[in-house]
Each structure stands twice: as C-alpha cells, then as structure tokens.
Amino acid sequence: MEFSPRAAELTTLLESRMINFYTNLKVDEIGRVVSVGDGIARVYGLNEIQAGEMVEFASGVKGIALNLENENVGIVVFGSDTAIKEGDLVKRTGSIVDVPAGKAMLGRVVDALGVPIDGKGALSDHERRRVEVKAPGIIERKSVHEPMQTGLKAVDSLVPIGRGQRELIIGDRQTGKTAIAIDTILNQKQMNSRGTNESETLYCVYVAIGQKRSTVAQLVQILSEANALEYSMLVAATASDPAPLQFLAPYSGCAMGEYFRDNGMHALIIYDDLSKQAVAYRQMSLLLRRPPGREAFPGDVFYLHSRLLERAAKRSDQTGAGSLTALPVIETQAGDVSAYIPTNVISITDGQICLETELFYRGIRPAINVGLSVSRVGSAAQLKAMKQVCGSSKLELAQYREVAAFAQFGSDLDAATQALLNRGARLTEVPKQPQYEPLPIEKQIVVIYAAVNGFCDRMPLDRISQYEKNILSTINPELLKSFLEKGGLTNERKMEPDASLKESALNL
C-alpha cells in the first residue's frame, strides 16, 4: 500500500524543512583596484561602503575609505602600497577602524592600529573601541574643578591645569615642549601613590606623531627607569610610518584614554605633536585630490583637531565623574603663533603654555613666557594654598618685565623701582627647575611663599637653588601635609614656616 500524505501534513512538512534550512554561505562585497600610487588606492565596485570603514587588500594590507565618489572609492593604505597592483581584489570588513583599550595596554608601546611594537608579545584581556566617536555632550559634562599637577613650579603656580582641561604646549623646536609633557607623566607617580582609591589614579597616554624611533625608544627608557610605565602607555606613529598612520595615531590614543574616562577613572593624553598630524593630513588630502585652502591645508583641518580635542572632558557625576585631560603640542616656526595651525589649536584649547627660544638660551628652563601663557579654566582647580601664595607673583613679574626694559637706559633709579627689579629677578629665578625632577605641590608652595614674601630679596641669585634645597630639607613634614587641605593658609599657618625660612636665608 503506497503512502499518500494529506495536503495539511505536506504543508507542515515543507514549512519545517524551510525553517530548518541552513546555508553556510558568507557574502563579502568586493571591489577591484583601478589605480594605486603614493599610498592612495582608487577602488571600483564597493557601492555599500561606509565612510571611515576598514578594507583589506589581497596582499593582506589594510586601508581606510576616506573619499566616497560616484565612480570609485578613495582608499588610504595603512602601510606599503608596493604589493598592491591594478586589478587586485579589495574586501570590505564591515567595521569602522577600532583599537584595543583597557588596563592591559598599560606599560605597552603600540602602533596607530593598536598592534604591539615593543616585543613583549600579544595583548592580554582587552576590549575594542572605535577610534572616531562623538565627544560627550553638554549635559554629560561638568566644569573642571580637580587639579592635575605637573610638578613644575612655573606651571602649577602661574598656569594651573585641571582634570578634563585641554592645555596647549606651544613653542619652537628645541624649547622643551616634550620635557614639560614627560615631567608631567613622571610627577603622577608620587600623586598616584597618595591616592586612597583607584578613582584618584591618573593614567597617562603618550602619542608620538612623526618622531624619530630613537627618540621614542629613549622616552620608553626614561619612563621605565622611573617606574612610570606601570600607569602609562605609548602610541607611536614614527617618521618612517606612512602618513595615514600619523593621521590616525591621535584618534587611536584618544580612544584608549576614553576607556578610563568612561569608566569613572582619570587619564592624561599627550599629543606630540599635532603640527605633524596636520602635515600628514594635508599630504593625504592633496593625494585624494581634495581642494586645498590656506597654506595648502584642506578646508576641514580645523575640524581635524577640534573633533579630537573636544573628546577631552570632565564627565558629570551621573556619568561616572571620569576625566580625560589633553596636552596637545604644537611646533611653531620662528616663534610665529599667528600661523594657521597654531591659531586653530589655540582657539580650540582652554589655554596655552608658550615657550620661547630666547628664554631657553638665557637659562630660564622651563622657558615659559608667563605673559603669553594662560589657563582659562585651571584656576578653579588650583589648590587654595597655592592660589593664596602666588596670587601677586604674576602681577609682580609683569611689572618687572615692563620696568626692566626701561631700567637698561637709566642708572638713577628710585628705591621702589630698585626693590621691584630686585624682587622680579628672584621671582624669575625661583621657577627654574632641572629636567626629570618634578616637585610635589606642597614643596612648591613653600618655595614660592619664600620668594613672594621677600625671604630671598637680599640673597645672591646663584644661591637661590641652594636656599630652596635647604628649606625643603628643614621644613616640618606635618606643615607640608597641611598645605594640601582645602582650607588653604590661615594666619597661624602663615607664621609657622617664617622662622625656618628666615633662618635658612640668614645662613646663605
């Protein structure tokens, strides 16, 4: 007898077969290389590609889609284009460029794509974050109110920086821009050791753009010897790397820093330097045939830096209260701060530290021009004791510079002018500091207190550094601790250090 299923059973059988039907097919959208040269590939056939999407060439080299045109796509190659030729297949990855992030990155040196280049093996447990994300909105932010100490007397007293601030370091080549950044990283060791919980720790990300490999290796050695690598990571796109990697490195470093910001922790990121990133971006844009503007930079070069620096922020209590502080570095040519890129970045940041070649050669190091340097939001984050101590010093320095220019022409100066010149010379001497020797904030307060209150006025200038060492070795440690309290300097506390400061001054 033949089996003849009923219509209803047949329908059910067919439906179940269709539902359970499984195919292991994976569809990739691919295109072909039309032309290639100078690190730019024109690809035909990738109709559904997204802007900023990562693609993979047949040779294994990766690239990013930057120009989406009617006929083809302009792809910037991350690496050498010598293995790519006309007619090669190009595959979409379906993902926007992302990099590894997390505490596993601490102590490591990676390239702009997050691949380790320090020879310590693969990265352990980490998450991946997109390099290009939207900056936090207004509601998600909070005004800057916590100090970020650099350990430099000239910075912490006159141009204070807060957590979540963007403070530009600007100056000619060889004026000590990187030295300020490195000293800031080294100073966090003692600041982190004082923290009672992890939320007070400040992690550091250093992004080296277009620097020599030997310079980066030297920096790693300095941080390693100071045990600063345990809370730091480096992203390096060196001078020998292609322009696209130099363009991408700051965004990659920022994504790594945002991991801490978004998880209720604090991070500091140093971009050294953004002038080289702008040059790399100009090179890419011109090769992509984008219309040039002022100084041959593309029209969106302002947006290049603004979208990067806006990601540095202090988050509100509702969103975790984390912060990302940015110290971008810009190199000027012959002290011209009114050039295109310097003015752009000055207008984006919350202040700038201006370094001058002339001051550097006169032995004033760090070579900070106090008149041009400013911190627009940092004073809200400055310790009360420091604010009380250095309140008058900036005005006195400004008056000193004004009078010193005219004092060269006249010899018969009245007593008040002579006293002003005398005090100004000492206030110029006190902020001098050797490299890689950051000073704790409470010790800075004592030294500046001594200078502002006239304890150094009768002392020869060459004895001031010795006087500083003497007072720091004899001052009461309990008194130093009291300066860190929020109450600031009371009248009783002001009288306390006076005796030991006078005694040290008399000895010299």
UniProtKB/Swiss-Prot annotation:
Name of this chain's protein: ATP synthase subunit alpha, mitochondrial
Q: Which family does it belong to?
A: Belongs to the ATPase alpha/beta chains family.
Looking up HAMAP family in the UniProt record yields: ATP_synth_alpha_bact (MF_01346)
For the site labelled Required for activity, the residues are: 373
Q: How does it assemble?
A: F-type ATPases have 2 components, CF(1) - the catalytic core - and CF(0) - the membrane proton channel. CF(1) has five subunits: alpha(3), beta(3), gamma(1), delta(1), epsilon(1). CF(0) has three main subunits: a, b and c.
Q: GO biological process: what's one of them?
A: proton motive force-driven ATP synthesis
List cellular component terms (GO): mitochondrial inner membrane; mitochondrial membrane; proton-transporting ATP synthase complex
- Pfam families from the entry? ATP-synt_ab (PF00006), ATP-synt_ab_C (PF00306), ATP-synt_ab_N (PF02874)
Q: Which PROSITE patterns match?
A: ATPASE_ALPHA_BETA
Binding residues annotated for ATP, in chain numbering: 171-178
Q: State the Gene Ontology terms under molecular function.
A: ADP binding; ATP binding; protein-folding chaperone binding; proton-transporting ATP synthase activity, rotational mechanism
- Give the keywords, sorted: ATP synthesis, ATP-binding, CF(1), Hydrogen ion transport, Ion transport, Membrane, Mitochondrion, Mitochondrion inner membrane, Nucleotide-binding, Transport
- The gene that this protein is the product of is ATPA
Location(s), subcellular: Mitochondrion; Mitochondrion inner membrane
Entry's NCBIfam families? atpA (TIGR00962), PRK13343.1 (NF009884)
Supply the InterPro entries for this chain. ATP_synth_asu-like_sf, ATP_synth_asu_C, ATP_synth_asu_C_sf, ATP_synth_F1_a_nt-bd_dom, ATP_synth_F1_asu, ATPase_a/bsu_AS, ATPase_F1/V1/A1_a/bsu_N, ATPase_F1/V1/A1_a/bsu_N_sf
Stated role = Mitochondrial membrane ATP synthase (F(1)F(0) ATP synthase or Complex V) produces ATP from ADP in the presence of a proton gradient across the membrane which is generated by electron transport complexes of the respiratory chain. F-type ATPases consist of two structural domains, F(1) - containing the extramembraneous catalytic core, and F(0) - containing the membrane proton channel, linked together by a central stalk and a peripheral stalk. During catalysis, ATP synthesis in the catalytic domain of F(1) is coupled via a rotary mechanism of the central stalk subunits to proton translocation.
Q: Per its UniProt entry, which superkingdom is the organism in?
A: Eukaryota
